[in-house]
Amino acid sequence: MNKEKVPQNAVPNGRTKLRQVTSATPLDEVFQYWEEDGAIVIKGLLTSAQVEQLNQEMGPILQKVAIGGHASDVRLQNFHGMKTKRAGDLTNNSAVFRDHLLDNDFIHAVSQRCFAYRGKMGPDAYWLGSASTIHVGPGQKPQTLHRDLGSYPIFWMLGPQGPESQINFLVATTDFTEANGATRIIPGSHKWEFNQHGDRDMTIPAEMKAGDCLLISGKVIHGTGGNKTDQERGCLAVTMCANFLAPEEAHPFIVSMGTAKKLPVRSQRCLGFRSQWPQSSPGLWTKDYSELALHLGLDD
């Protein structure tokens, strides 16, 4: 769509700082704040010891990953960040990710409530879209403002009244500051018509301590800030999407069977090692219309 032809008259909701909760906060309160602003900070989702271990586990991977990624499209290169490291394959390489994020009760509670679509899809109607680092290096320019639901065009067509296609848990593995590229949000923009794009002056930084988590709607306008420091800003992005949508990462082709067999059932399901059973569906991701886990021998 040509942005110049559409009057840009949407305004933020006036929030100057995102509200903060913890994993112990009642879900009704979490969802109230999240639905009002499109983003919320969860304090202390990981402990300092877990963050330290996670950074140690990901260190060797980050040393090898290409800065800026491998996309041949210049537009995607700029979007991903020419001075940003995006490394996946976390399930194979990080015990902290496996034990404390992929199998995190709070993340699952939020995802379960979000993707149940008010009970129409059943309790487990989500799986892992992607999990990757977003390590923003010194000198990285601000990312183009965007909505994450762009990966699923049909949801774009449904507009802001449509259900969520995906949500993102951005876990800080270093402190997030305005100077080092804290993710920037336009509060309330998830309620705008999708032909409204906002601008950087409307954004506020989601400043956090390492271990905190920024939960964002797939509809909210956001983008990584520019890093004006000499230190890297560390982040782990954990995306959940509806389980009738293709995930960004091809987890069953990446995660080893040896690793998968050691995981809890809900982690196996989230990674696509088990079938998906949305309410009223005869089953998705099956073998002979039966549970995939039987074919894979996960229940032996």
Swiss-Prot record:
Pathways per UniProt: Mycotoxin biosynthesis
Q: Which InterPro entries match?
A: Phytyl_CoA_dOase-like
Which species does this protein come from?
Answer: Gibberella moniliformis (strain M3125 / FGSC 7600) (Maize ear and stalk rot fungus)
Gene expressing this chain: FUM3
Instruction: Please give the knockout or disruption phenotype noted for this protein.
Output: Produces only fumonisins B3 and B4.
EC assignment: 1.14.11.-
Summarize subunit and interaction data from the UniProt record for this chain. Answer: Homodimer.
Any one GO molecular-function label of the UniProt entry: metal ion binding
Per UniProt, which keywords does this protein have?
Dioxygenase, Iron, Metal-binding, Oxidoreductase
State the Gene3D superfamilies in the record.
q2cbj1_9rhob like domain
Q: What protein family is recorded?
A: Belongs to the PhyH family.
Query: Where are the annotated coiled coils located?
Result: none
Q: What class of enzyme is it?
A: oxidoreductase
> Which residues participate in Fe cation binding?
H146, D148, H222
UniProt-listed GO biological process terms: fumonisin biosynthetic process
Q: What is this protein's function?
A: Dioxygenase; part of the gene cluster that mediates the biosynthesis of fumonisins B1 (FB1), B2 (FB2), B3 (FB3), and B4 (FB4), which are carcinogenic mycotoxins. The biosynthesis starts with the FUM1-catalyzed carbon chain assembly from one molecule of acetyl-CoA, eight molecules of malonyl-CoA, and two molecules of methionine (in S-adenosyl form).
Record's protein name: Dioxygenase FUM3
Identify which cofactors the protein needs according to its UniProt entry: Fe cation
User: Could you tell me what induces this protein?
Assistant: Expression correlates with fuminisins production.
